[in-house]
Amino acid sequence: MTDRLTQLQRCLDQVMEQFCATLNFIDKRHDFEPFNDKEPKMTDKHASVATPEEFSNGIDELSTDIIVKIRQITTLIDSLPGVGVSAEEQLHKIDSLQKKLVDIEDEKIHAIKKKDDLLKQVDDLITVFVGGIADSRRGTSLAPENVQEDNDIKQEAEVPTSSEAIEQKIANEKIESKIEGEYNDNINEDSDSKSADSELFMDKDDADNISESISPGKI
């Protein structure tokens, strides 16, 4: 809401615009009239001439708007504080308004301070609440019963409980025994081949001895 002086200025601007609009309507929409009875009435096909009834109604409407606006201006002028009021009364009223303004400013400062205090209290409560939750979670995670539960879970995880785990363990044992058997067979084959080679070498020595014994020089 604006003050009365601003309202008065706006009303003066509006009434000036209405005066200009009225003059423009009269200039653009009036009919042609001769200066005397001897001159013929002139016409212009490009002009936007209003009929006598339209012209009269337009003038009435524009005049009514101007009258209403002038009454508003008069009312605002009569309501101005300087009209019919002495200088002492005006100064007293100004002092009273200044005191009210100071009181309102103090209330504003007090409300802002109270708001800041409430915000700080809320922040402290949130900090305490979050810290309590964190401490409770930390204490729960470090409790002895929880450690024992974790160990039990690990032991249960190491022992196969499902049929698939048991079958997998049996298959692994079979594979290990098969690999061990193949390794032993390879060792046995190597020892047999070494024995056969030694027998062949011994047979060759015997053959040499026999050939020497039956040589022509000894016969």
Curated annotation (Swiss-Prot):
InterPro entries: Med7/Med21-like, Mediator_Med21. One of its GO terms (cellular component) is mediator complex. It is found in: Nucleus. Keywords: Activator, Coiled coil, Nucleus, Transcription, Transcription regulation. Residues 210-219 have a biased composition (Polar residues). One of its GO terms (molecular function) is transcription coregulator activity. Residues 166-181, 191-204 have a biased composition (Basic and acidic residues). Residues 141-219 are annotated as: Disordered. Pfam families: Med21 (PF11221). The keyword Transcription regulation applies. One of its GO terms (biological process) is regulation of transcription by RNA polymerase II. The keyword Transcription regulation applies. Belongs to the Mediator complex subunit 21 family. Component of the Mediator complex, a coactivator involved in the regulated transcription of nearly all RNA polymerase II-dependent genes. Mediator functions as a bridge to convey information from gene-specific regulatory proteins to the basal RNA polymerase II transcription machinery. Mediator is recruited to promoters by direct interactions with regulatory proteins and serves as a scaffold for the assembly of a functional preinitiation complex with RNA polymerase II and the general transcription factors. This is Mediator of RNA polymerase II transcription subunit 21. The gene is SRB7.
